[in-house]
């Protein structure tokens, strides 16, 4: 099936020329190109048109899950009849396995998987396995992390055809091999049930159930039914069922893997014995033998990903399989906000290697654990066929890669201009900011404020709430899907102000924002570099009254470059508007998106609680954001014995948040202490039953 783009508007401004140049470049075999487009110029729209023109499976890589979600929503609206997929990390919480030699502390892996994102990941891989050409996958850097190989996945695809003779039990064995679980009582995603001659399969990548009925050994009907009402939705002559997990293996591969693990275990034991380290020798022996026994009996073990090389049949040091392996060789890639995404890709391998070094060195893992890793940067680049780097501020690497093939997109279809930038003294910056917020609120527009630290963002939010301003914050401690919800609530008018650190930058599409305030703009560094300031200022470029205020006591080189470049672009835009009789038009954009369906089911944390626009603005007593408290050893407190069930549940929830925050800050020792507190509190809660 070809790409069928849904266009509410026709390309205007710089877009037609940018689309033509990029399409010609891809068709002529250009390996790399740069799309240098200002904020609000419609880069995503240009990308969609190029995808439709080229007609190849496409990967769009974004540097964080929030922007990936936004891109996914937009691409879904452009290609409603094609396969637009979403592939990001499915962890709501992830504490990696670690060992701290200084305190001789081993911390076990702990995680929480988001089932909705897991479904979308499986859907993305299934679409690629199907061989469709009209596939767009929007991904975070997760696409370079290890997963099962395409051959193993393809071999596990189950094809069924009406009228085909298939023994039912043979079909059930195939389902089990594809990692579906039998559950005749509670049919959930990734399970199947059998009732007489009918088999219901709740596909792992779908919201619906596939119902297959037999007449003797012949397949009589294949239907898709609603997972709740079981009403028929569609009927098929044939159908393909894709695996329920991204890591599929056969019995033969498992047996081979166990033999290889055993061989490497003996080598590692001999190594530790040769250097006289009997403790590490005994440790690796006990741990690996236990894992092998679990794999033999159950087919899996905790940390089985550290043995992935054996199951995949890879040699030591050979790169793992990843999402890129599922694309055809002629696929097209867009790297959005490339000035941030490219460095992120290059940094992933080093961080992973550093953490595992201690685990291998001290006998917790075999050296094969090193091969369960993200791609190295050169491995990633070797897999790229043709790429378009997309950024308002491309870095030197992208410009060099493109060899001068740079397509500029300065003019906005709406006629909107780059925002006016003002520099004001940092003295009394909060009072001055408050006055600006009041003015914006009177005009029913929103405000973004960027600070230098998460603590500053939280405290400023608390201050604004205390002064009757509907405010919230987002930073790395806020759950991914909650960030999207908070930004949608800002657009809907539930908040007046959104405070952030490094998330209020690339790609955020918030046309209701008329003011961007940058606190401490003269503090040179990563968050106040030329590119960072330009990107942050760009958040005001989607509003007809857009303005940027930099609070600073001096004008740094980065500030001056941003001011000069913004002024240059503004002059070009003014001239274009005058020549073509264009009056700037405010952007109007729907708020609800493709991710909203499953976001509604995600438990909302306190700092994403919506504020009804029909109610009076909350004060600090009626609504306060979550400010991280000092750690408290709840379970060690004698008061715990007198706590009610509700109080215990709240303490467990609070401690869980602290554990997640500690893990994100790589304070694994503290996170483990919180985990132990949670276990003790849960034990106390059971006694209350």
What is the predicted function of each stretch?
Residues 1-36:
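Conserved pre-motif I regulatory segment
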Residues 28-34, 56-57, 133-135, 445-446:
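Pre-Walker A (Motif I) flank of P-loop NTPase domains
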Residues 28-50:
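Walker A/P-loop
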Residues 34, 87-432, 436-442, 461, ...:
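N-terminal cationic and glycine-rich segments that engage phosphates or anionic surfaces
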Residues 57-69, 86, 280, 440-462:
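Conserved strand-helix element at the start of the C-terminal RecA-like helicase core
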Residues 80-89, 303, 446-448, 460-482:
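Conserved RecA-like helicase motor-core motifs
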Residues 151, 453-475, 680, 684:
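Conserved helicase motor "Helicase C" RecA-like lobe of SF1/SF2 P-loop NTPases
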Residues 478-500:
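Conserved helicase ATPase core of P-loop NTP-dependent helicases/translocases
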């Amino acid at each position: 099936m070809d790409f069928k783009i849904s266009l509410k508007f026709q390309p205007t401004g710089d877009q037609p020329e940018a689309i033509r140049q990029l399409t010609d470049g891809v068709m002529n075999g250009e390996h790399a190109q740069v799309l240098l487009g200002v904020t609000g110029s419609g880069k995503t729209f240009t990308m969609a048109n190029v995808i439709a023109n080229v007609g190849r499976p496409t990967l769009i890589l974004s540097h964080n899950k929030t922007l990936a979600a936004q891109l996914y929503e937009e691409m879904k609206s452009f290609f409603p009849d094609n396969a637009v997929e979403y592939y990001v990390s499915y962890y709501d919480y992830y504490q990696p396995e670690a060992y701290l030699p200084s305190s001789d502390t081993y911390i076990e892996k702990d995680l929480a998987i988001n089932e909705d994102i897991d479904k979308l990941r499986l859907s993305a891989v299934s679409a690629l396995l199907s061989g469709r050409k009209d596939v767009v996958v929007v991904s975070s850097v997760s696409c370079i992390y290890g997963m099962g190989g395409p051959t193993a996945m393809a071999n596990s695809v189950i094809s069924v055809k009406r009228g085909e003779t298939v023994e039912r039990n043979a079909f059930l064995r195939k389902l089990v091999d594809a990692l579906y679980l039998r559950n005749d009582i509670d049919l959930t995603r990734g399970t199947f049930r059998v009732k007489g001659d009918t088999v219901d399969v709740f596909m792992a990548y779908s919201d619906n159930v596939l119902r297959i009925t037999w007449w003797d050994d012949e397949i009589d009907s294949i239907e898709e039914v609603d997972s709740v009402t079981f009403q028929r939705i569609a009927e098929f002559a044939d159908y393909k069922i894709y695996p329920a997990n991204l890591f599929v293996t056969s019995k033969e591969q498992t047996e081979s893997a166990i033999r290889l693990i055993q061989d490497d275990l003996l080598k590692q034991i001999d190594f530790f014995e040769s250097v006289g380290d009997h403790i590490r020798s005994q440790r690796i022996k006990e741990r690996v033998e236990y894992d092998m026994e679990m794999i033999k009996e159950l087919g899996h073990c905790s940390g089985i990903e550290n043995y992935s090389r054996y199951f995949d049949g890879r040699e030591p040091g050979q790169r793992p399989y990843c999402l890129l392996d599922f694309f055809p060789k002629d696929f097209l890639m867009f790297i959005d906000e490339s000035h941030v995404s490219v460095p992120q890709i290059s940094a992933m391998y080093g961080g992973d290697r550093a953490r595992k070094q201690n685990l291998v060195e001290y006998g917790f893992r075999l050296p094969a654990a090193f091969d369960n890793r993200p791609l190295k940067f050169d491995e990633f680049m070797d897999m790229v066929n043709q790429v378009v780097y997309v950024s308002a501020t491309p870095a030197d690497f992208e410009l060099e890669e493109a060899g001068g093939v740079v397509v500029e997109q300065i003019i906005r279809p709406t006629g909107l201009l780059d925002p006016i930038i003002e520099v004001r003294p940092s003295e009394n910056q909060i009072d001055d900011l408050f006055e600006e917020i009041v003015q914006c609120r009177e005009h029913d527009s929103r405000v973004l404020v960027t600070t230098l630290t998460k603590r500053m963002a939280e405290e400023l939010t608390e201050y604004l709430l205390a002064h009757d301003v509907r405010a919230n914050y987002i930073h790395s401690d806020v759950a991914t899907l909650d960030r999207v919800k908070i930004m949608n609530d800002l657009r809907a008018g539930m908040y007046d102000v959104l405070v952030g650190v490094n998330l209020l930058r690339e790609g955020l599409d918030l046309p209701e924002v008329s003011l961007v305030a940058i606190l401490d703009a003269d503090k040179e560094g990563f968050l106040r570099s030329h590119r960072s300031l330009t990107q942050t200022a760009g958040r005001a470029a989607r509003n007809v009254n857009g303005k940027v205020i930099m609070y600073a006591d001096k004008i740094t080189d980065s500030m001056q470059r941003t001011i000069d470049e913004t002024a240059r672009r503004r002059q070009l835009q003014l001239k274009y508007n005058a020549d073509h009789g264009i009056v700037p038009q405010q952007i109007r954009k729907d708020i609800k998106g493709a991710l909203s369906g499953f976001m509604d089911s995600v438990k909302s944390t306190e700092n994403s609680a919506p504020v009804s626009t029909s109610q009076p603005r909350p004060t600090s007593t009626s609504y306060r954001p979550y400010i991280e408290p000092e750690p408290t050893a709840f379970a060690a407190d004698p008061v715990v014995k007198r706590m009610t069930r509700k109080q215990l549940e709240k303490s467990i929830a609070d401690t869980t948040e602290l554990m997640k925050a500690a893990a994100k800050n790589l304070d694994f020792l503290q996170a483990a202490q919180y985990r132990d507190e949670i276990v003790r509190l849960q034990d106390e809660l059971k006694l209350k039953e």
